[in-house]
Amino acid sequence: MKTLIRWASALLTMSVLFISAAASARPAEKMDLPDWSRTLVEDRDLGHGVHMLESFGGNIGVLAGDQAVLLIDAEWPQLHDKVLAAVSHISKQPIRYLINTHWHWDHVGGDGQFGKAGVVIFSSEQTREYIEKAQASKASQAGAPYAPDPAAIPVVTVNNGVKFHVGGQTVEIIHVPPAHTNGDLIVHFIEADVIQTGDTFFHGFYPDIDQPHGGTIDGMIALYDTLYKMSGPNTKIIPGHGPVANREDVREYQGMLREVRKRVARAVAAGMTEEQLVASHPLDDLDKKWGGNLIKQPYLLGIVYEELKAAN
């Protein structure tokens, strides 16, 4: 239950609502939603018809084919018209396909609007299940703005090896072992040499690990070996949040998470409580590079502590 409460608070952070002090050892904080009328959706051209749209929520991948457009993730619904405008500058072809990397609102909030327009939505089986449950659950609706909307439910569930062929490009879907959640998809634009990770990788700040939905720090650390092997020196990586990255950024991120895990494991072995661990500020040196954004040190310490404590 403590993990569920803590994770729900982190989801609120990701959805930029509020965080309860009771959810973790960190102090309460409140983050306001932006002025949507002034929020930009910025286009990063990655070549070969692949673009990254960057804005308030999760990054969107765009593949512009000669007959159709494929999107990866859907942003906040309040930004839907701006997303459409950005896509229209890239291609005049219709948006036909939408792939959800996972179920969190800042990546699937726009699903309903796309679904109503006839876009076919794809996800893992787990992601579809979580979206359905979030729509039906009053608790989830209170924690994030899910509401009953059949058009927002993915209509096709996919697993490893599924490939899209759009505009001469091959797009491979990979359902990775549990990492950020247990339903994560990463997307490989093969000819373009681009990989989109969803929230399995944040570029420049601590990760979110959705433990109640199968997330695990060990799974994230292991995934970065896979991402590194998939990548070459010129591969562009679209993270869930943050700027475009490369494989050396992934390797550096893996090193940071290994260090976090090592320090928390040492505290667990020494018999420290979670509160004692948080009070000791063991990640202050890492905060200088990785802290101060979406995920704060006390939250990360708490979720890693619970995972390692449960494993003992």
Task: Give, region by region, the residue ranges found by the protein language model.
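Short N-terminal segments immediately surrounding and downstream of signal-peptide cleavage
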Residues: R26-L46
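Conserved beta-strand hairpin/beta-sheet module of binuclear metal-dependent hydrolase folds
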Residues: E42-V87, V187-F189, V194-T197
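Metallo-beta-lactamase
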Residues: A68-V69, W76-Q78, K163, T170, ...
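Divalent metal-coordination and catalytic microenvironments
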Residues: G49, L63, D73, V87, ...
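Bacterial N-terminal signal peptides
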Residues: S9-S20
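Active-site HxH/HxHxD metal-binding segment of metal-dependent hydrolases
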Residues: A85-H165, N182
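Positively charged n-region of N-terminal signal peptides that target proteins for export
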Residues: M1-R6
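Accessory terminal helices/loops
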Residues: A21, R26-M31, K229-N234, P243-N312
